[in-house]
Structures are given as structure tokens and as C-alpha cells.
Amino acid sequence: MSDSKEPSVQQLGLLEEEQLRGLGFRQTRGYKSLAGCLGHGXLVLQLLSFTXLAGLLIQVSKFPSSISQEQSKQDAIYQNLTQLKAAVGELSEKSKLQEIYQELTRLKAAVGELPEKSQQQEIYQELTRLKAAVGELPEKSTQQEIYQELTRLKATIGELPEQSKLQEIHQELTQLKAAVGELPEKSKQQEIYQELTQLKAAVGELPEKSKQQEIYXELTRLKAAVERLCRPCPWEWTFFQGNCYFMSNSQRDWQDSVTACQEVGAQLVVIKSAEEQNFLQLQSSRSNRFAWMGLSDVNQEGTWQWVDGSPLSPSFKHYWNRGEPNNIGEEDCAEFSGNGWNDDKCNHAKFWICKMSAASCSRDEEQFLSPAPATPNPPPA
């Protein structure tokens, strides 16, 4: 194989020499090797240039593809955001609709519980006022207040709308009438208060129209019974051992105090027993007030006499405070003072105590239908 290669090399060398001669070059030593290298260098440069150009073309071809991919990603994101926005909008609307639906459901339930006619609200208000009035009975109420409340209640009951449970209301009214019949004692007033509370609850469920007349009649009888409430003593008077006593809240001289008691059918207090004396003395000392009693020696100095004309019993003389009565400066009228009695000038203004007999109360139901005696108002306080 070496023999075959040598002729080829020789031929290549001869070809190069001929080319150089044609170009006017002189043949020198080592020239052959340099020309061979230069001949191969151009080929290498061409290969390198082609490689660089190919790489550049590849990179340039990739750049539009990257831009296209980024644009596609942005389009996808935009579409996703659009869909998400639409979904959120639908979710918000659904939430609002759900909230509105719940509100309407509650409103529907509330409306479903409403009474059929606006009259029920008026009845409820009337019963509330009636309950408040009766709740204050033990303190400083009057029969006139109860009468007015029952009159208004009677007027509204006549307009009651439909719905049943009349029997329950009828029973409540029967119990209420029975409680009113037992009212002479203050403790019974609480019973009426409870009955009225139950009546209010029953009326809230309303009877049928056909039964309204029966309820109207019951309330009319009840009103008459309340109007004739039998009490041992008028309002603001205190009961003790069959008598009623009024303690004034203002002051007058002795003679004006006598007149004030007479104007209400009573008299300035006349003491008849030791128990009564102790009761009155306690009332006076608790209030820390000096109060006139119906005792004086105006007609004859030293002779003490009650306003009913009876003389002072010798057994009562020990109720005078020590050194009393002393008649200093024309002191002719007796008063409750501290733990005993004192004489003072009759023109001095003091509190006073009236006394009258207590009413006789019968629990017979027929008595409620009979005219009741007029109840005296307390004297101006």
C-alpha cells in the first residue's frame, strides 16, 4: 500500500509546482509544505463559517418561536382570568340571591305569624296598660283607673277578629271574676294581676266572632264587679282593728285638721284603747312627724276632751310626755310627739291623723250586683 501512495504524492507535488510557475513564483526550499497547508486552510475556514452561520440561523429561527409561545401563554392566562371573573361574578350573584332568599324566608315566617287584623295590636296595648294599672293596686292606684282600663278593653274586645280558644278565655274570665270577689284583702290583688296576665295570653289567640257577645257580657259583669270592689278602707288609708286611718302628707293648724277629716266623713283621731294608742304612736314615730290628734282643752283650760265630746280617760294620762301638758303660752291642743303626747299652740301647722270605721265586706256574689256605697276620697294632703 505504501508503493501506491507515493506516486500520488509525487503527482500532487508536480501539480503544485506547475501552478506556482504559472503565477510567477519561484520554487524555493520548503515551499511545497507551505503551499499545502494554505490549500487546506481555506477549506477549514469555509467549514467554520458554515458552522457559525448554521448556528446563527438556528438561534434566529428559535426567537420567533419563543415569542409565539409567550403570546400563547398570555392568551391562555387572559382566558383563564376572564373565566374566573365570570365565575366570581356568578358566585357573588348566587350569594346575594341566597341571602335575599333567606331574608324572604324569615319575613314570610314572620308574616305568617301575624294576626289577621290590626285590632290585635290595639288589644295587646290595652291589656298591657290594664296589667300595669292592676300591678300598682297595692300602692296608690284608684278604682277609677281600673274602670277606665276595663272600659277601653271592652270597646276593643267588641272588634276582635277570628280565631278560636274561647273556652280558655271564658275560664280565665271566670277565675278573674272569682278573684275580684275575694278582693277585700290586699294579698288578693296579686291574684288578679296573675289572672289578667293569663287573660292577655289567651286573648292573643283570639276567639271566634260568634262568641264575642259572651265575652262582652263577661267583661261587662267584671267591670261592674271591679267598680264595686269591697275594701275595708279607701285607697291610701291604713286598716287597724276595724278602723281606717289616714296620715296626712301636708301640715295644717289644729282646727283646719278637724275640718279636713270631717270633709271625708271621718274625724280627727279619737283614741279608744291602749292597742290603738300604741299603733298610732308607732306610725307617728316611724315617720318622725308631729301630728295632731282630736284632743284639746280649748273649751275649758285643764279639761281635756276629744272631738266626739268624750272626756280623756284618767288611764290615758300616762301617755303625756314628762312635764306635759304644761300650757306654756296657751298650749291647748294635743299632738303625737316622740314616744308620747305633747300640748302645743293650736295655730301651729302640723301633720294630722283622720279616723273612720272600716267598711263591712261580704263575699256573697249577689252583693256585687247591689249599689256600692260611695268611697270617700282622702283629704287633701
UniProtKB/Swiss-Prot annotation:
Residues 96-303 are annotated as: 6 X approximate tandem repeats. A motif (Endocytosis signal) lies at residues 14-15, 16-18, 31-34. It is a single-pass type II membrane protein. Residues 240-355 form the C-type lectin domain. Glycans are attached at residue 80. Residues 1-37 are cytoplasmic. It is found in: Membrane. Pfam families: Lectin_C. Ca(2+) binds at residues 324, 326, 328, 331, 342-343. The chain crosses the membrane at residues 38-58. CDD domains: CLECT_DC-SIGN_like (cd03590). One of its GO terms (molecular function) is D-mannose binding. The keyword Repeat applies. Sequence repeats lie at residues 96-118, 119-141, 142-164, 165-187, 188-210, 211-234. Residues 59-381 are extracellular. InterPro entries: C-type_lectin-like (IPR001304), C-type_lectin-like/link_sf (IPR016186), C-type_lectin/snaclec_domain (IPR050111), C-type_lectin_CS (IPR018378), CD209-like_CTLD (IPR033989), CTDL_fold (IPR016187). SMART domains: CLECT (SM00034). GO terms for biological process: adaptive immune response; cell adhesion; endocytosis; innate immune response. PANTHER family: MANNOSE, PHOSPHOLIPASE, LECTIN RECEPTOR RELATED (PTHR22803). The tandem repeat domain, also called neck domain, mediates oligomerization. Homotetramer. Interacts with C1QBP; the interaction is indicative for a C1q:C1QBP:CD209 signaling complex. Interacts with ICAM2 and ICAM3 by binding to mannose-like carbohydrates. Interacts (via C-type lectin domain) with CEACAM1 (via Lewis X moieties); this interaction is regulated by the glycosylation pattern of CEACAM1 on cell types and regulates contact between dendritic cells and neutrophils. This is CD209 antigen.
